[in-house]
Amino acid sequence: MAETAYVPRLRTEYDKSIRTQLTEKFGYGNVMQVPRLDKVVLNMGIGEAVNDRKKAEQAAADMALIAGQKPIITYSRVAISTFKLRENQPIGCKVTLRKAKMYEFIDRLITVALPRVRDFRGLNPKSFDGRGNYSLGIKEHIIFPEIDFDKSGESWGMDITVCTTARSDDEARALLTAFNFPFRQ
């Protein structure tokens, strides 16, 4: 008896409807030309980690809960005396999500986390980089339901970059709109 592998909801939606919508809209001749999600990069810069190493470890633990994958702690490359920063001090953490974990994270981001942001009016439609990638910033990482603020005790910002295989911003915007990203009008 063969068991079927788990496929995330957004991946199924992409395969069934989004791919055909984009093919009709942009007139692709080949299925491989249709833009798709490539990866999602989460980054947390922790300024307080310069004075207290435990802050970077706590941020990494919180990011592991959010992403479902262990992040790496990033270290400074150069010394900056005005920030009291020495070389090789922990300054944040990052994680790259691909395949099923990427689709699960985007699903949670769109359906659960972004609606919990105070005074949320939609994502900025101008945050594309010109090559089909989209970046957004979150002021508080506690909007994710996996984080218990009482245990975490701190609230940090987070950068989220959604990398796609789209060649232009218009193609990427159409792809992310099809995934129900709430862009401002």
From Swiss-Prot:
One of its GO terms (cellular component) is ribosome. GO terms for molecular function: rRNA binding; structural constituent of ribosome; tRNA binding. Pfam families: Ribosomal_L5, Ribosomal_L5_C. SUPFAM superfamilies: RL5-like. The keyword Chloroplast does not apply. Keywords: Ribonucleoprotein, Ribosomal protein, RNA-binding, rRNA-binding, tRNA-binding. Signal peptide: none annotated. GO terms for biological process: translation. This is one of the proteins that bind and probably mediate the attachment of the 5S RNA into the large ribosomal subunit, where it forms part of the central protuberance. In the 70S ribosome it contacts protein S13 of the 30S subunit (bridge B1b), connecting the 2 subunits; this bridge is implicated in subunit movement. Contacts the P site tRNA; the 5S rRNA and some of its associated proteins might help stabilize positioning of ribosome-bound tRNAs. Part of the 50S ribosomal subunit; part of the 5S rRNA/L5/L18/L25 subcomplex. Contacts the 5S rRNA and the P site tRNA. Forms a bridge to the 30S subunit in the 70S ribosome. Belongs to the universal ribosomal protein uL5 family. This is Large ribosomal subunit protein uL5. It comes from Rhodopseudomonas palustris (strain BisB5).
